[in-house]
């Protein structure tokens, strides 16, 4: 039975995601992906052109999922304390839902300069992330001026929070 185009594209994406999470990007070939789907390699290339495009689309799905998960709750935070709690909760919720993703993110950042550039384009330059970071920065300024917290670099605070949460998941067996 012939599978419709959109469904085939989805199956290829799901197979690639599963294999990338299981084996990593470098150890996964488009042949592996095609075998898992039950199609030929040409079909994988037809829909995505390159393995890198597949990787980018999967990475973007995770970034967008993470951003959407926190969008409403984070925007409602009125203080740095509330925002810190919400960001930590957001990452714990996300990584609990997708337990292999921390390894995937970290491994690909370490292994590939190409992927580091892609992360910059997909995550660092993400408009939702920029908006949330600006909100964090404004809340920090407000709380510093009100004498509630000491002077702190917003980027350092965010990096420390995410690193601590991420390390909790990377330490799991």
Language-model features: locations:
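Short, flexible, glycine-rich and Lys/Arg-enriched loop motifs at helix boundaries
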Residues: 165-173
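Conserved hydrophobic residue
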Residues: 25-26, 115, 149
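Hydrophobic alpha-helical connector segments
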Residues: 72-103, 154-161
